[in-house]
Structures are given as C-alpha cells and as structure tokens.
Amino acid sequence: MKVRSAGGDGDALCVTEEDLAGDDEDMPTFPCTQKGRPGPRCSRCQKNLSLHTSVRILYLFLALLLVAVAVLASLVFRKVDSLSEDISLTQSIYDKKLVLMQKNLQGLDPKALNNCSFCHEAGQLGPEIRKLQEELEGIQKLLLAQEVQLDQTLQAQEVLSTTSRQISQEMGSCSFSIHQVNQSLGLFLAQVRGWQATTAGLDLSLKDLTQECYDVKAAVHQINFTVGQTSEWIHGIQRKTDEETLTLQKIVTDWQNYTRLFSGLRTTSTKTGEAVKNIQATLGASSQRISQNSESMHDLVLQVMGLQLQLDNISSFLDDHEENMHDLQYHTHYAQNRTVERFESLEGRMASHEIEIGTIFTNINATDNHVHSMLKYLDDVRLSCTLGFHTHAEELYYLNKSVSIMLGTTDLLRERFSLLSARLDLNVRNLSMIVEEMKAVDTQHGEILRNVTILRGAPGPPGPRGFKGDMGVKGPVGGRGPKGDPGSLGPLGPQGPQGQPGEAGPVGERGPVGPRGFPGLKGSKGSFGTGGPRGQPGPKGDIGPPGPEGPPGSPGPSGPQGKPGIAGKTGSPGQRGAMGPKGEPGIQGPPGLPGPPGPPGSQSFY
C-alpha cells in the first residue's frame, strides 16, 4: 500500500506495506482492554469519530459546492435560452414588419393613382416612421439589456472559474494534508524506534540494578559472616578474661592470707620480743624462712604486678575492641539503613519504570492501531477524492465547453444584430428616399390640382408601374442614442437536451500549496495496558556520587547492664596513725621450749 497525493503525481510517497510489516514485527501488540473488555472511551475511537465527522463535513461541503455549480449552470443556460428566444422573436417580428412595409410601399403607387386618398396615406407615413424609430429604439434597449445579461453571464462564468480554482486549491490542500499525514506517520515511526531504544536502555539499567542487588546481598552476607566471626572471637576473649579474673581473685585471696599471716607473725614477734634472746636458734631459722618467704613474696608481688600490667593491656585491648565493635555495629547499622533505603528507592524506581513502560506500550499499541486505521481511512479518502476530482473535472470541462458554445452563440448574435442594424439602416434610407419622392409627387399633384378645373371627370385606368429608382448615396452614420431602460425578463424557455460528452481534457497543473490547517483537538489519555515481560539485566552502571550527609539519628535504646569490672590495683599504704593506748596484758602463754645452748662465754682475767 502506498499513500500518494490526490494530484496523482506520486511525489508524496511516504509509507509502504513492508515498513508497516517491519514495524508490526518489532512492536508487540497490546489490545486496549479494561478488565477483559474493550475500553469504551479510548483515544483511538474518539480520533476515528472526529475523523469520520470531518470527512462527513467535507462531503457535505463538496455536495453543497456541486449544487451551487449546478444551480449557476442552470441559471446561465436559462438566461442564454431566454436571450436566444428574445432575439429570435424580435427578429421574426421585425422581418414581418419589414415585409408589411415593403408591401405597403409597393402598393402606394397604384393606390395613389386609383384613389385620391393617397395624400392622407402619405400624411400617415410620418407617425408610422416615428413608430418605426420608437421600435428601433426599443430594439436598441433590448440589445443593451442583452449586453447587460451577457455581462452577467460573463460574471457568472468568472465566478464558476473562481469556484473551480478554489476546488483545485482545496484538492491541493487535501494532497498537502495527506503529505503532512505521511510526514507525521514518519515521525511516529521515528518516535516508536526511539521508544524501542529507550526500552532497551531501561532493560539494561534493570539488569544493572539486579546485578547491584546481587552484589549488595553478597556484601551483606559477607558482613554478617565477619560479624559472626568477631562475635565468636569476643566470646573467646571474654572467657579468657573470666578465667584470668578467677586466677587473679585466687592470687588476691592468697595475698590476703599472707598479709594476715604476716600480721599474725608481727604480733607474735612483738609478743615474743622478750623471749628472743632465749630462742636465737629458732630466730635464725625463722629469719631464714622469713627471708625466703620475703623473696617468694617479692616474686609474687612481681608476678602480681606483671599480671596487673597484662590485665591493663587486656582491658585497654578490650576497650579498643569494644570501640571497634561499636564502630562496626554503627557501620553495619548505617549500611543496613542505606541498603534498605536503596532497596526502597530501587523498588519505587522499578514500580515507576514498570508504570512508564506499561504506558509506553499502551501508547505504542494505540498509535500503531491508530496509524493502521488512519492509513486505511486515508486510502479510502484518497480514492473517493480522486473519483470526486475526476467527476468535478468532467463537469468543469462540460461547463467550459457550454460556456465556449455560449460565447460562440453570443458572437453569432452580435453578428446577426449588426446585420439587422445594417438592414434597418438601409430600409430607413429607402423609406426616406420614398418619402422624398412622395413629397415631390405630392407637389406635382398639388400643381396639377390647381390647374385642373372644378369639373372632375371619371378616374382613368391605373397606369403601369414605374421603374425602380437608383439607390441613393449612403448617408452618414448617426450618433449613438442614450442607453435605454432594461426591459422586463421574458418567460423561461424549456431546457434543451443534454449534449454529448466531450473528450477528456489534459491534466491541469498542480495548484499552489494551501495554508496550514488549524491543529486538531487533543485526544483523551488512553487506559493503562497490561505490563510487559521482565527484561534481561543490563550491564553494571558507574558508581554514583556520594549522597548528602543525612540528619542525626534518634538516640538508640539503652543497652543491657554490663558485667562487673575487674578489681582495681591495691592502693599504697596510708600514713601510720597515732599509737593507741596500751592494752591489757594478755593471758600468759605456756612456757616455751628450751632454747639451744648458747655460745661459750669468754673467760675474764680479773
């Protein structure tokens, strides 16, 4: 199928069946449905209705134009028929009058000889000549009225020619509108291809989004795995710290026991200070034991200090680890919020993209159906316009032919009128010559009657007819009289038979491009179509710029109560207080063991 202009030149070729078939293969068809039934108020139906109404208006306009042309043609034919009948009637009347005048003039001589009333008849010739002049003036008035009617017919012919030109211009505008429709179809096809490209880009972006979702899920899974490992590591560290706290508590209890022992030893040493001299051997052993115990206590103190340093290091490490855990929890919570927000935004974008794709598919389907219907309808309109154009061309050809025939008949009528005027001039000159001759004869008769006696004899027989005199010299042409009043219109004559159709004339030149028409009304929005199938994921896109810093979050709930901390270091011994009052003497203890023998004393030499 090819869409051409109405002019028949074939220059406005725009859309072919192959292109439409290719477009049908590329574009999926989605019916304009609404819950399983066709939509009652789709844009395609409204556009079809508006197009039908516009075409009906165009047909009505063409029908009115044809009726007007037919009425004008009938009026022209009636006027021409009435003119021809009036001219034929006037011609026949004047022919009859001229024949009668010739007969009367031929019968003047015998009447003048036979009857004496010839003078009276000669006296009546003056008013008859005046009547003839009046009739000639009436003929001139009729001819002037006929000229006016001829001018009116020429004006009607000009009106018909202008209407034919307007029809040709309208046909040119129709061809131009068809060309514009072809251009708009090309633009629609380009838009459809652009929509296909955008759908392909959207499919690629959806693929990228799904790939990013998979990557985010993998990252979240990895973060959860690392969080589990760190939690297990923290539990192990907590177990070790618990064990170390237990050992430290044991060491502290041992240290407290030792301090109690030392305090008891001090009390015993004070109590046994008086008996030191007696138990020197036990004191040496006890001093050795005390030195050993002090060394062991010094070692224990050093071990306790090392353990305290280790515990300080462990506590600082635990604090750092706890801070790292808090940071990691904060980052994980922030990442989870960001992922949730991104997933929500992605879901919103996906929903909006699905809605847009659905609307795009519905629009593509509607435009496809509308374009197909427009092409079919434009093809029908083109055929009807070409048929109407051919019929109009034939009618205009017949009308031009009839106008040319009418012009030929008017030329013939003018020639016949000129011949009639020449004949009338010749007859008037002959009449003037006859009148002059009759005046001369009248003068002769008057002289004869003067010389004749009163007695009157019987009239003699009529004499023979005289010879016709020579033609006189042609007189000067008289001035044109004033324009007479237009005569009344005669009765309409019967319509003549229709002539044979003539040969088809050559194809006329293409008219100028008409003005651009007014833009049509905007159609209503179509209903949403069914969603299309899900596309393949596209390639991964570039990393976007970091978003703006969000507002500070709301304070979180208070955490659970922590475990009791490790006991702090033992403080330095305070200042020695004032000595208290002397206590009561205690119970005398049992006698001690006998001490070892003392060293031998030195011998004095007094």
From Swiss-Prot:
It is found in: Endoplasmic reticulum membrane; Golgi apparatus membrane. Its main location: endoplasmic reticulum. The keyword Plastid does not apply. The chain crosses the membrane at residues 57-77. Keywords: Collagen, Endoplasmic reticulum, Glycoprotein, Golgi apparatus, Membrane, Repeat, Signal-anchor, Transmembrane, Transmembrane helix. It is a single-pass type II membrane protein. It comes from the Eukaryota. GO terms for cellular component: collagen trimer; endoplasmic reticulum; endoplasmic reticulum membrane; Golgi membrane. Residues 1-56 are cytoplasmic. Residues 78-606 are extracellular. The keyword Repeat applies. Residues 455-513, 544-603 form the Collagen-like domain. Residues 485-519 have a biased composition (Low complexity). Seems to protect cells by scavenging oxidative molecules or harmful products of oxidation. PANTHER family: PHOSPHOLIPASE C-BETA-2-RELATED (PTHR39082), SCAVENGER RECEPTOR CLASS A MEMBER 3 (PTHR39082:SF1). This is Scavenger receptor class A member 3. The lineage of its organism: Eukaryota, Metazoa, Chordata, Craniata, Vertebrata. The gene is SCARA3.
